[in-house]
Amino acid sequence: MKPNLGRDYIIRQAYEFEGPVIQDLYKNTLVEFLDWDAPLDASWVMAVNPDKPEYYAVLNLVASKPIGRLEMLRVRDGIPKRLRACVVRDMIHYSLLVLKQYGCQAVTGASEQDLVTTFGKVIQHRFHGTPIGQFTGYLARL
C-alpha cells in the first residue's frame, strides 16, 4: 500500500527541543558533533510518524529573498523505499510552499550524495526545476 501523508507520516516544523533527534538522523556525518542541545530555530522541517516518536527525515530551509534554499536533506536509514520517496517528495513540496509564502521567487537545493537522484527527480519532474551545475559543499566550524 502506498504511504499516505497524514496517516503514515506528517511533515512539520521541528520543535526547538528536537535538536538531539536531528543529531541522531545525522549520525556518522560531519555535523553529528555540533551542539544539537541548543534550541533550534524555525528553519528545520521534519517528517515524522503521527502516532509514535519515529522520525523519518529532516530538511533545512533558508528563507532569503529573492532566492531561498533547501539544504541538508537527510533520511533515516532503513525506511521502506516507497515511504522514503513519498517523504522526500512531500518535504520538498511543504518546504517550497513555506519559502513561497515567505516571498522567495526562486529556490536552490542541495542534498547529501546518496539522495541526489531522488531529490533531483522530485525538483525536476514535480516542480519543473532545472539543474544549475555541480557543487562541492564545505563545512567550517565557527
What does each model-identified segment do?
Residues 26-44, 49-50, 56-75:
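A conserved beta-strand-loop-helix scaffold within acyl/acetyltransferase catalytic domains
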Residues 1-35, 141:
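Short amphipathic alpha-helix that is part of the acyltransferase structural core
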Residues 56-58, 126, 134:
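Residue-level detector of high-confidence beta-strand sites
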Residues 17-21, 65, 114-117:
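Short alpha-helical
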Residues 5, 38-41, 101-103:
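Flexible, charged surface loops at secondary-structure boundaries
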Residues 130-142:
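C-terminal "cap" of GNAT-fold acetyltransferases
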Residues 68-132:
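Acyl-donor binding region in acyl/amide transferases
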